Amino acid sequence: MAVRQIKDGEYTATIYRLIKEARYGEAIQVLSNELQKQYRSRAGLSLLGYCYYQIQDFVNAADCYEQLIQISPEVEEYKLYYAQSLYKACMYPEAMKATFALDNAAYQSKMLKLQASVKYGEEDISGAKSLVEQMPSEDPESEINMGCLLYKEGHYEEACKKFITAMQVMGYKQDLSFNIALCYYSMKQYAPALKHIADIIERGIREHPELGVGMTTEGIEVRSVGNTLVLHETALIEAFNLKAAIEYQLKNYEAAQEALTDMPPRSEEELDPVTLHNQALMNMDTKPTEGFEKLQFLLQQNPFPPETFGNLLLLYSKYEYFDLAADVLAENAHLTYKFLTPYLYDFLDAMITCQTAPEEAFLKLDELAGMLTEQMRKLTKQVQEARHNRDDEAVKKAVNEYDETLEKYIPVLMAQAKIYWNMENYQMVEKIFRKSVEFCNEHDIWKLNVAHVLFMQDNKYKEAIGFYEPIVKKHYDNILNVSAAVLANLCVSYIMTSQNEEAEELMRKIEKEEEQIAYENPDKKIYHLCIVNLVIGTLYCAKGNYEFGISRVIKSLEPYNKKLGTDTWYHAKRCFLSLLENMSKHMIMLRDDVIVECIQFLEHCEIYGRNILAVIEQPLEEERMHIGKNTVTYESRQLKALLYEITSWNL
């Protein structure tokens, strides 16, 4: 960026105009340039420190104020601003040391507040509490400080009351409203939390339209608003992050992503750690490589969101990067005790063990499951006793604790089941699920996985229907919210139990919804009905009826520009590979017209599959596939060449 040229005599006026117009970046550039000429100018350093503070660059602000203290040690404000800048930069030991230089009685109250904030930042809650108790009780900020301490101790309800009292005394303040929302979120009372968040957002839009709320979601290209003090005071970033977290907890994943794009636009290097963490987490399904990079980057920062460490390890386990998870645990032993609960550590330890010693891992998981089931039995008893005593608060507390324990138990149970699933020992998987029916029979994830394991056993389609049907009926009005695999498995189960009418009715329902979406959004690709037909085609191929099965597979991918995708190609090529294998062994013969149909299909896939990946590679794969080979076009040519070779047709 070119340095602004300023005429003689206009320097001071230009600087103050830039500051007045909140063009701090330009002001910093001019001031930095001028300070090279006038080394350690007090006026220049003071303005530069102020500008750095306004754009939240606290490290450089602290550097300016440190120089100012050396120039003018008698000015107490510089000592205060220096300590505040160090605190804001999370340099807590340095900030605490700087506060001791404040010996003017007029700054006693501010010094105490700053020292308490430093102790709070260092998570020295008892130290912070003793300092807060020294402050005047009539100071409304003491209510806020006590609220923060109560929140940190997990007393969310009492903390919430403190913040509400402070708001009544001080009037509406965005940061207080956010604190109240955060308390409600921690108590899992999402409706009042969202109400306070909505208030913050509405006020931010009304008072600061220049911050461009919602512009990115609308697809409008806007320049970064930067990390200004104004943005910080609106609490918009915090509000949108909390809204995203609530929507994510409620499994409204699109709304969660939208909350992140609705926030005022900033460039990636300007993003705060919480936003970066949430972006990584909520876009993991579509941008896993990027997500891992962001979480790994955050782990190197100080401080980072406390959830980062556990989430990175859990995601490594989800994607089966157990070696990486083990490395992170070994390299960051000091973080283990600080950021991982005993439950999470034991769970991750068992998951890592799965890779090399599945039997040992199963025993570790079994021990963890036993501990959690014991807790749930105790909590069930507490709920019954509280209901008998008509103690609604105790009932509510015990039910919440039970639900939290169940959410810990489900992943442990699924990890146990997966060990036997990978061995294709489906009877053992079913046995594990049956043992957990006492606790999980109402849980959607449990019901879904029970359905899958029954479906895989071939002779239990009727029982599988009993579990798949309630899931589908629950979302019948928005049937495309159900995964295509579930719909396909239910259709196959209907066919295998001679309930063809039910299968056809379900397929008509899917077709009707797909037509409606195609009408509203012609460019959107929807694969549900296509995958259902592909799975049915696969079923007929598996039963040896290749002519009907392959024909169904081919028809399901029409029109190719709408139906050909990585997932649909995966199902189609499996059928073709099975067909070619059986033809090469002379176990089946195809009529010439069917072979012609197959060749035409593969040629269509070759045309439409140029920009479609044949395989979605793992995000952290070191050896990447050749870009020219990882396409549907390349694989369809390979299949066509094999078909010509096996049938001895002339090219």
Curated annotation (Swiss-Prot):
Keywords: Cell projection, Cilium, Cilium biogenesis/degradation, Coiled coil, Repeat, TPR repeat. Residues 494-521 form a coiled coil. One of its GO terms (cellular component) is cilium. The keyword Methyltransferase does not apply. GO terms for biological process: intraciliary transport; protein polyglutamylation. PANTHER family: TETRATRICOPEPTIDE REPEAT PROTEIN 30 (PTHR20931:SF0). Required for polyglutamylation of axonemal tubulin. Plays a role in anterograde intraflagellar transport (IFT), the process by which cilia precursors are transported from the base of the cilium to the site of their incorporation at the tip. Belongs to the TTC30/dfy-1/fleer family. This is Intraflagellar transport protein 70A. It comes from Xenopus laevis (African clawed frog).
